[in-house]
Amino acid sequence: MQYKELLHKLLTGTDLSGKEMEECFSGIMLGEYPDSVIAAILALLQKKGVTPEEVAGAYFAIISKALPVQLGDNAVDTCGTGGDQAGTFNISTVAAIIANGAGVPIAKHGNRSVTSRCGSADVLEQLGYRILLPPDKTEMLFRETGFAFLFAPLYHPAMKAVAHIRRELGIKTIFNMLGPLVNPAKVHRQVVGVFDMRVMEIYAQSLIRTGCSHALVVHGKTENGDGLDEASICGPTRIVEIQNGEITCHDVEPETFSLSRCTIAELQGGDSSRNADILLRILDGSATKAQTDAALFSAAMACYVSGRATCIDDGLSKAKGSLESGNASKQFSRILALNAELAGK
């Protein structure tokens, strides 16, 4: 489709088909459109509101150009959209490590900080993880430990074509939604935290279209009613569950899982050094109860979607066992050691 025809459709508020969107984003990734046209497409999509078909079309365009990495069919990703401005520590990253200690294979897709002071890549790098490990060695690490971190800029080199345009636009675009979806390992099991409750249904429908087998899309609230792209122990959490093509929705409270409420201030993070310290304290048992419970809640969800647990309650039991036995800490030390060894070869 010529970009003038594409722009005309978007200007009139017409939704694109999945095929049209895939062709459009393939053109964007390949640098076939002028920067001004790409900026217009992104802004008009945002104004119109994206559909699941459009999100899925963009997904297929981006994933087809990602560096391939083979991590099997059962790996789980815990990744949020960011954008909630809450300043929490790296909850989903700690949750992934705890779940891995419970036997859950993890393919954590992440990046450096965009909307916070410390992204998942920043905190892992602070702890010594070599985030630029190439795909073949990442596969070796995963085979030995069941854990891999997939640094988004390494696996999505074509995304560089739009990075400066996104910065110049300075608004949320469809790319903010796509981040958690375009895991280069093509995971079928996910826990996705979203910053805006209004996009939960779009996410769920998009996940079905991209081949998801079991996922939880979550949006939490603070004690003040502000949104979080995490499951919350400060207030209620809405969970949209996708399993075998079916979508269900329910709201839960911390007390549903015998978790104590806390304030958002108790979950505040900081720079990579501060967040790395919190992560290690959670693993060694010296963190606050609020910090530990927040990580356990998200880890429980990862255990559930992996199939290692029959429900979130059972997942919480598995996650607690991972921490209390010391297995999460030992496993993470093993991951760091092997990661460094592979990076040095």
UniProtKB/Swiss-Prot annotation:
InterPro entries registered for this protein in UniProt: Anthranilate_Pribosyl_Tfrase, Glycosyl_Trfase_fam3, Glycosyl_Trfase_fam3_N_dom, Glycosyl_Trfase_fam3_N_dom_sf, Nuc_phospho_transferase
Enzyme Commission number(s): 2.4.2.18
Cofactor: Mg(2+)
GO MF term (any one): anthranilate phosphoribosyltransferase activity
UniProt GO cellular component terms: cytosol
Residue positions binding Mg(2+) 2: D229, E230
UniProt keyword terms in alphabetical order: Amino-acid biosynthesis, Aromatic amino acid biosynthesis, Glycosyltransferase, Magnesium, Metal-binding, Transferase, Tryptophan biosynthesis
Gene Ontology annotations of biological process type: L-tryptophan biosynthetic process
Pathways per UniProt: Amino-acid biosynthesis; L-tryptophan biosynthesis; L-tryptophan from chorismate: step 2/5
Residues reported in the UniProt entry to bind anthranilate 2: R166
UniProt keyword annotation of Magnesium present: yes
Catalytic activity: N-(5-phospho-beta-D-ribosyl)anthranilate + diphosphate = 5-phospho-alpha-D-ribose 1-diphosphate + anthranilate
Residues noted as binding anthranilate 1 in the record, renumbered to the chain: G80, N111
Residues the record lists as binding Mg(2+) 1: S92, E230
Family: Belongs to the anthranilate phosphoribosyltransferase family.
Protein name: Anthranilate phosphoribosyltransferase
Organism in which the protein naturally occurs: Chlorobium phaeobacteroides (strain BS1)
Gene field: trpD
